[in-house]
Amino acid sequence: MSDALQRRTGSDYIEVGATLLAAAAEGQAGLAATIVSPPTLVLGSAQSATDAATGADVVRRGTGGGAVFCDEGVLLIDLAVPAGHALAPEDVTEAYRPLGEAVQHALAGLGVDCRTVGVEEARAMDDARKAAARRACWAGLSPYEVVLGDGRKLVGLAQRRRRGAVLHQVAIPVTTPPAEVLSHLVEGALLAQWLQETAMVASVAGCGSATPVGTWDVLREPLNALLRP
């Protein structure tokens, strides 16, 4: 599968992850980058379909967490690796570390003042915020996700494991505000206070690469390097 940035429907995006995961189970690491059209609400694997409001296509991804609203302003990245790879240690949390650090370093090259989330920082979320994160990805924090220096969330990470392989998924709002998801969730306004703690690359980058294409140009080689044995 090509690692060139591709425009895909929501359903095709879901299929990309499944295809990469199956290939990884056979020993082949892979990488794909996507922008979604038409706009689609992507639910987490265990999220209730009743969370979705009308007005956009709805699909369900294989990784957990809350919903992400995806359109041509959100960069989606899938990486899949076989068991035994550096991105597939037994410790699920630590599997995120090299990926989060690579994304953080690349975004810093765009002039973004950002850092990765510490394990204890993520665990310190109160119950109300944890509940919000089960509905909207951007409402919560997970270890090694990328946030700005002031703590606003910039990059979401998720992971799916099957026998012999691990799929990592990355979501980066480049020109679409993360809070756009609120319009596509039932009673989404109730989550607004947590979505204020988010940002998009276009509003914080210090150079002209703050488009999905430009952002992928910066991330493509570092992420390919992660896949190499």
Regions found by a protein language model. Give the residues of each.
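Aromatic/basic-lined ligand-recognition segments
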Residues: 134-147, 151-158
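Active-site loop/lid in soluble adenylation, ligation, and acyl-transfer enzymes
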Residues: 1-54, 60-61, 84, 130-137, ...
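Short, structured patches in soluble enzyme cores that scaffold and shape functional sites
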Residues: 45, 79-83, 103, 158, ...
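Internal, conserved structured core segments that host functional sites
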Residues: 78-136, 143
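Long, positively charged amphipathic alpha-helical accessory segments at protein N-termini or as interdomain linkers
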Residues: 104-132, 160-229
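Short acidic-glycine loop/turn motifs at beta-strand connectors
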Residues: 37, 72, 148-151, 162-163
